[in-house]
Amino acid sequence: MVTINNARKILQRVDTLPLYLHAYAFHLNMRLERVLPADLLDIASENNLRGVKIHVLDGERFSLGNMDDKELSAFGDKARRLNLDIHIETSASDKASIDEAVAIALKTGASSVRFYPRYEGNLRDVLSIIANDIAYVRETYQDSGLTFTIEQHEDLKSHELVSLVKESEMESLSLLFDFANMINANEHPIDALKTMAPHITQVHIKDALIVKEPGGLGHKACISGQGDMPFKALLTHLICLGDDEPQVTAYGLEEEVDYYAPAFRFEDEDDNPWIPYRQMSETPLPENHLLDARLRKEKEDAINQINHVRNVLQQIKQEANHLLNH
């Protein structure tokens, strides 16, 4: 909510918000190699975005993970020519995954690496493994010049992630806040944001419908503006984080229509619940005769989200202006 207290902060920041194209917005096209990593740079540039967030596997045979050093360097060179920042993402926190993501980040000139854990086991055991993974990141890469974010990704609660970051004592580690992933941990967006707020530096923007499951909640991602997420309120809170300077340095535009994630945490769980193993995020492909239309729609949805987010930002700006001038 825009208030007199935060209206000036909003007006100072809203027009220069660092929006990043997120590769998952083109997930189906990239799985079928219709959109490739270099194409994301062109799309980001054409839409006047600050940079791209791309997974090491996006683009399948043509992914960053399959590029040689020369190709990675060329990708980084193209980004710099277009004045775009690069963030690298990986969907694990183990040594091999981190090493791969960091190597790609350094070879492309990226500034940041996102990871999230995917372990099975009782909560305390899982948190211990993750803490060890983070210790490896700190000991090996804290002087790499990269920043690191751990994303809240459906299975851990906000306070658990905050504890991991605080206990790591790693200055270059912070939290990436996703608009919907807390739902699956049986939390709600504004509550999760308030808990994580002191440690959030990056964001994934999307919308989703909350799906009630026995004892818990799932989410089905949808077109931004058509879901249950408090879209404008979340953006307003995030813009205002940081006193003198904006705390959030990257907002990833992650439209992911039709992605579904089930409940992972439940109302009746004990204090050391079982955390099930989860696969990497994936949106189902349609049947062949529907494929071309679905791929076209995915591209349209991605561009429409950019426009929707900018429209919401202008609404927030207008509310701030109105408050200060009346």
Swiss-Prot record:
Signal peptide: none annotated. This is Uncharacterized protein YihM. It comes from Escherichia coli (strain K12). The gene is yihM. InterPro entries: IolE/XylAMocC-like, Xyl_isomerase-like_sf, Xyl_isomerase-like_TIM-brl. Transmembrane segments: none annotated. Gene3D superfamilies: Divalent-metal-dependent TIM barrel enzymes (3.20.20.150). It comes from the Bacteria.
